[in-house]
């Protein structure tokens, strides 16, 4: 059986580039995950490097998940050809999960800006918006959710500024769930955002990855 990666496109915005999570990224990602503050903020458990490689492989092969590494364009060296990991510019990751058993068009969004040098520059906001636009255009997502620990005030502030509203709270997990229904107006705004996103790709057997505007083939 041939295994297909779920994501075969890189998305270039004004300040960030979203690239598929590659094996070359794993050592740096593993280094981030040694930070107890990041583990708490993301609700993650520490993994060994070997487990991190296994996780990377499972994420990239999961048809119900899209995972991108966030690159800070200020630190990218060389060309932005698709397939180049640009580890030197890694700053975080952004994901969407289609894990609602009752509605496959609902997606949970996660964002992490791990590098202190890249915080406070609006990279998290731009990454989330590009990911949401990607989800609406490619995957026909009609509602986004975000689950955020109550102590993660930065993420709560970001998602609320984007228009997410609280839908529930878990006292056991001390976690807030926020929702963002994709109304017609919001869909138009997200799709308009794609006009400014450059898509870097190579040939893919996944039709849903060929629907973005501004293509640059590499």
From Swiss-Prot:
The keyword Cytoplasm applies. It is an enzyme of class 2 (transferase). Residues 36-183 form the N-acetyltransferase domain. Belongs to the acetyltransferase family. GNAT subfamily. Signal peptide: none annotated. Its main location: cytoplasm. Its EC number is 2.3.1.48. Pfam families: Acetyltransf_3. GO terms for cellular component: cytosol; nucleus. It comes from Arabidopsis thaliana (Mouse-ear cress). This is GCN5-related N-acetyltransferase 9.
């Amino acid at each position: 059986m041939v295994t297909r990666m779920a994501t075969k496109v890189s998305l270039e915005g004004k300040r960030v580039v979203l690239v598929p999570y590659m094996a070359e990224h794993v050592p740096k990602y593993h280094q981030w995950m040694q930070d107890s503050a990041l583990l708490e903020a993301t609700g993650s458990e520490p993994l060994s490097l070997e487990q991190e490689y296994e996780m990377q492989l499972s994420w990239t092969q999961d048809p119900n998940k899209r995972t991108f590494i966030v690159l800070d364009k200020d630190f990218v060296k060389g060309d932005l050809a698709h397939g180049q990991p640009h580890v030197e510019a890694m700053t975080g990751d952004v994901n969407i999960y289609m894990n609602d058993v009752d509605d496959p068009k609902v997606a949970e969004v996660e964002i992490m800006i791990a590098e202190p040098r890249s915080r406070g520059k609006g990279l998290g906001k731009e990454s989330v918006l590009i990911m949401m636009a990607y989800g609406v255009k490619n995957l026909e997502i009609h509602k986004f959710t975000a689950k955020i620990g109550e102590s993660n005030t930065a993420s709560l502030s970001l998602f609320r500024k984007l228009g997410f509203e609280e839908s529930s709270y878990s006292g056991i997990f001390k976690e807030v769930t926020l929702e963002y229904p994709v109304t017609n107006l919001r869909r138009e705004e997200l799709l308009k955002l794609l006009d400014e996103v450059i898509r870097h790709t190579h040939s893919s057997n996944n039709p849903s990855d060929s629907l973005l505007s501004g293509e640059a083939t590499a």
